[in-house]
């Protein structure tokens, strides 16, 4: 079933709002990508509003981790330690922006949106 992101058809009082038009395709949404930690990266290209394209990362194995000096490295993701978006995401190894991930070189905080950007960028946390 599609996700409709249009205005509610109910008034605050509970009464119905009768629209003078049908639902529009532009008001449709999609399920979240829920990027997981995996053995190799998996990307999906989807068509978006205006015929544009969005790269959706569905499975991630590597992250671009940057240190304080700005030097970056491509490192393997081991697991998700903490995720402020939802505490169940850490248990399910789902990566979102703001998640703390464990990598080969230490803990890092995700700064990109993997479901929107198609890549995991992170900054190294000092321990």
UniProtKB/Swiss-Prot annotation:
Q: Which domain of life is it from?
A: Archaea
Family matches, as InterPro entries: Ribosomal_eS8, Ribosomal_eS8_CS, Ribosomal_protein_eS8_arc, Ribosomal_Se8/biogenesis_NSA2
Q: Which GO terms describe its biological process?
A: translation
What the entry lists under Pfam families is as follows: Ribosomal_S8e
Q: Sorted alphabetically, which keywords does the UniProt record give? A: Ribonucleoprotein, Ribosomal protein
A Gene Ontology cellular component where this protein is annotated is:
ribonucleoprotein complex
For this UniProt entry, the molecular function terms from Gene Ontology, in alphabetical order, are: structural constituent of ribosome
Family membership: Belongs to the eukaryotic ribosomal protein eS8 family.
The record's annotation in NCBIfam families points to:
eS8
Q: How does it assemble?
A: Part of the 30S ribosomal subunit.
The protein's name:
Small ribosomal subunit protein eS8
Instruction: Give the encoding gene's name.
Output: rps8e
């Amino acid at each position: 079933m599609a996700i409709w992101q249009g205005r509610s058809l109910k008034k605050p009082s509970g009464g119905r709002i009768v629209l003078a038009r049908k639902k529009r395709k532009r008001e449709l949404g999609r399920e979240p990508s829920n990027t997981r930690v995996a053995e190799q990266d998996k990307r999906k290209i989807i068509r978006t509003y205006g015929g544009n394209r969005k790269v959706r990362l569905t499975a991630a194995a590597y992250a671009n981790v940057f240190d304080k000096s700005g030097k970056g490295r491509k490192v393997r993701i081991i697991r998700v330690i903490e995720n402020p978006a939802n505490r169940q995401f850490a248990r399910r190894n789902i990566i979102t922006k703001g998640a703390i991930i464990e990598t080969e070189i230490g803990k890092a905080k995700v700064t990109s949106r993997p479901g929107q950007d198609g890549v995991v960028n992170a900054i190294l946390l000092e321990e």
